[in-house]
Amino acid sequence: MDMDNELKIGKIILDVKAYEFSYEGYGVFRINKFPILIENLLKNEIADIKIESINSKYALARVINRKTNSPERRNIIDIETYRAGNTPLEIMNYVSQINFKKMILTDLFKREIGWTKNINFIPSINEFSYRNKITLQWVIENNDIKIGFFEKKTHKIVSFKKCVLINGKFNEFVRLFIQNLNNNRKEWLVYKNIFSVTFKYSEKYNEFLIIFNTTNSKNISLNLISKFQKNDLKIGIFQNIFNLDKVRLIKTIKIFGSDYLTYKIGKYKFFVGPNSFFQINEEQMLKIYNKIKVLLMIKGNESLFDVYSGISTIGIYLAHNLKEVISIEINKESVEFAKFSAKLNNVSNIKFIQKDATKYFTNLNSDSYVNNDNILVFDPPRNGLNKNVLYALKNIKVNKIIYLSCNPRTLVRDLKELIGLKYKVKFVEGYDMFPQTYHIETLVLLER
């Protein structure tokens, strides 16, 4: 291979060997230290590749002729979902996926915080059919509605046929929705404000929510909506109205049917609204919550602060073993459904605070609840803890922290800060909450 030739879009490079497999699921090859990330190429596989795009940090390429296959490779079951970038690890057998994620987590913790102990990594019971929620894109083009996933790194629709990440009944429901849409296409074409549709599903209770995500308040016809109703299903249909950049949710309108879904974690039931956060892999969630219960060794005199609590699944799940729970969540809908769920489960020792976690912790120093017996549970979004939350921890007396993270990189960043506050990492465990993807859920216990 001539390494000195100019790298450009469309260039074909022969006999490339992937010497690494990146965290994001690309085979990695370098020319003069410049990385080329190759889709659908595992470590040690050899292929002819074509450069698709280039920026200042790396190039992206695709395989045009794979010449060797890794023993870790398996056939793609669902090519549409893979093309959309939703299952980047589907090319790898499941045992190898677990080993890969464990290696990523182990290397990151060793490099960033000096953790040298073994990190156990818990596989999912189901490597497919585990999701209880999906969102499909909605595009009107040439007087036609296209609905499906965006092809990876494009705005080209991959039409929905099935998704291996949801189960058969959920797939059937989505296909029936699309069939109804096709049968009434002319009426739906007037709704140019719809940009995506979110589906939520409770398998145990056979309940569905459909949420139309829109950019203005043009009301969707109840006559059209009612055609989605089936006698054997409990369905709720909503319209979310966003600002024009599709980022900020302005308003939610209930159009038809049920207000919520019902889920069960262990012996506890939870009500979940159209915009309430709920983990998408329920079986893994139960494993994590049981592990938290074991790790905390609760005596009964503790107060637990459930921070970024969502509908307070963790707080409610542990409440009967605690003196009290303080649930802190900014989202109004989530707080309302958390209150409903607490009442449903006869949990009375829980206090709900609808407030941004940063603002709450800024004014926490004089709070009478904070003492050595109490526990903090953090389950933040992907960007991790706000610096002001970490700063506030300097002045409060909490000996135990549970940190549940969906982003290992922001997790280790925050752990460095907590270690600086004299906390010690006592336990680390990884969970495969998202099989076929590179995402990793990590549970950490800290003490001081």
What name fits each language-model region?
Residues 1-80, 113, 359:
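Terminal RNA-binding accessory module
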Residues 4-10, 15, 20-25, 217-448:
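Rossmann-like S-adenosyl-L-methionine
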Residues 27-32, 148-152, 338:
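Short, acidic/hydrophobic/Gly-rich beta-strand patch recurrent on exposed beta strands
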Residues 44, 166, 281:
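Short, conserved phosphate/pyrophosphate- and ester-handling motifs at nucleotide-, phospho-/glycolipid
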Residues 64-190:
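Extended interfacial segments that mediate partner engagement and assembly in macromolecular machines
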Residues 120-127, 195-200, 243, 429-433:
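Short, solvent-exposed loop/turn elements at beta->coil junctions and helix N-caps
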Residues 156-195, 202-205, 216-241:
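Internal alpha/beta scaffold segment
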